[in-house]
A protein has these predicted regions:
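NAD(P)-cofactor binding segment of oxidoreductase domains
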Residues: 60-102, 136
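Catalytic helix-loop patch of NAD(P)-dependent Rossmann-fold dehydrogenases
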Residues: 114-150
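Conserved Rossmann-fold NAD(P)-dependent oxidoreductase catalytic core, especially the SDR/UDP-sugar
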Residues: 87-127
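C-terminal amphipathic/interface module of NAD(P)-dependent oxidoreductases
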Residues: 45, 49-52, 232, 239-268
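Mid/C-terminal beta-alpha module of Rossmann-like enzyme folds, strongest
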Residues: 192-247
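Conserved N-terminal Rossmann-fold NAD(P)-binding element of oxidoreductases
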Residues: 3-7
Length: 268
């Protein structure tokens, strides 16, 4: 199987290493010329892409693709997500052979929903412009005419991106929140395992990828700050946003099991 990976950031770089044990011909894209030498050993070929790149020569020879793009400092959500999706969908519209596409979205598309639990079938109407862009991007991939799988990721944590590091940034800060909102996280290991699971089983449609641990922001970050001997965040008592818990039951029913179902405070 010829597989092209769009995006070699935090998740993409880790995935490329995991794919080395698989019988795939891997093609890699990057927007940074300085990363070509680093990525060469992880794939058959590395392509530098920009706004003028013709995606047809990259995508059409392949049997599938994984889209893991993320905005850089100078790129907007529209440029990174929506424009990329439109170009990919336009490239795939006349494809006759089977093709599998997996895109990692975000549970932030669920913002503004006034329900305690959110499933993949919950009607969405994002409030922010970025949320609207992410939801539109999902729709473009789902309507692209190929077998498409959307993984909505919770807050990512793992090596070099720990929850403790995040707590340090929040320490002593006044938060525009009561802290009573549930959290929805996912460990890097489970993201990689879920992507491979979706590839192996050709899952189609939208799947939430969050763990089973939804302790509140106040409980989580107070615990983390105590471990690090830091002042906890200062929570506001006035907020109209109660937050929500994202359900992972659909991907579990498909057969996926989590390596990190619960947060291990101080061990991430």
């Amino acid at each position: 199987m010829k597989l092209i990976i769009f995006g070699a950031g935090y998740v993409g770089s880790a995935l490329l290493k995991d794919l080395q044990t698989r019988d795939y011909q891997i093609y890699i894209t990057t927007t940074q010329e300085k990363r070509v030498d680093e990525l060469k050993s992880l794939g058959k070929e590395v392509f530098i892409i920009n706004d003028k790149t013709d995606f047809r020569d990259l995508i059409l020879p392949c049997d599938g693709m994984i889209v893991l793009v993320a905005p850089g400092q100078l790129k907007s959500y529209e440029e990174t997500y929506l424009n990329t999706a439109q170009k990919i969908a336009s490239t795939l519209k006349d494809r006759k052979k089977p093709f599998f596409l997996l895109y990692t979205s975000s549970t932030s598309v669920c913002e503004g929903v006034q329900e305690d639990w959110i499933t993949e079938g919950t009607p969405l109407n994002p409030i922010s412009e970025n949320g609207k862009i992410l939801l539109k991007t999902e729709q473009i991939y789902l309507e692209s005419g190929v077998e498409a799988c959307i993984l909505r990721l919770g807050g990512i944590y793992g090596p070099n991106r720990t929850l403790l590091d995040r707590a340090k940034r929040f320490s002593g800060k006044i938060m525009n929140s009561s802290g009573d909102e549930p959290t929805n996280h996912i460990h890097l290991d489970d993201i990689l395992r879920a992507i491979l699971f979706c590839l192996d089983h050709t899952l189609k449609g939208v799947y939430h990828l969050v763990n089973d641990d939804h302790r509140t922001r106040k409980v989580l970050y107070t615990s983390l700050c105590q471990i690090a001997h830091l002042q906890p965040p200062i929570w506001s008592s006035m907020t109209s946003h109660k937050g929500y818990k994202v359900s992972n039951s659909k991907i579990k029913k498909a057969g996926f099991s989590f390596a990190h179902p619960m947060l291990q405070i101080g061990k991430d």
